């Protein structure tokens, strides 16, 4: 629902907060997700914003599995969710009847290349990949991709979550 803009860039490190209005409508999915996110704020629900989910399983929905199978990678730093860290927290939050929107990612941001370098170093020393620019990516995809860093200050006020780079390694 967010993408880097004039106020939030990869370089400046200014994240998006739970209160920020969606600014990314580059695909039908993101349009629906953005409007749903705004509607969720009007109800007494727990809304956990997961991004680029990572697990320790080889699974088609696992972000690492996905990018190791892509022909080319557009490497931009993003917030990501390591599910082994976060799913137990979500259960505790539900048991406590917590409400509201939470950016449900590990603190920090990590690039696709950083993850693939770790994959190569730890899993497959022969692994290779090619990069392309965001513009080149947009030319071949039906919809654009959002890239962003989310603040986890609200989540960290409830529980400590490990930094993304520590957790992925």
How would you label these PLM feature ranges?
Residues 2-48, 55:
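Catalytic helix-loop patch of NAD(P)-dependent Rossmann-fold dehydrogenases
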Residues 7, 28, 34, 54-65, ...:
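Glycine/proline-rich active-site loop of Rossmann-fold NAD(P)-dependent oxidoreductases
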Residues 89, 93-147:
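Mid/C-terminal beta-alpha module of Rossmann-like enzyme folds, strongest
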Residues 83-94, 164-169:
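Short, amphipathic alpha-helical "lid/cap" segments that border enzyme active or binding sites
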Residues 26, 38-85:
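NAD(P)-dependent short-chain dehydrogenase/reductase
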Residues 78-81, 110, 150:
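Residue-level signal for the nucleotide or nucleotide-sugar donor/cofactor binding architecture
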Residues 5-9, 58-62, 115-117, 141-144:
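Short aromatic-enriched loop/helix-cap "lid" or pocket-rim segments at secondary-structure transitions
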Residues 125-127, 141-169:
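C-terminal amphipathic/interface module of NAD(P)-dependent oxidoreductases
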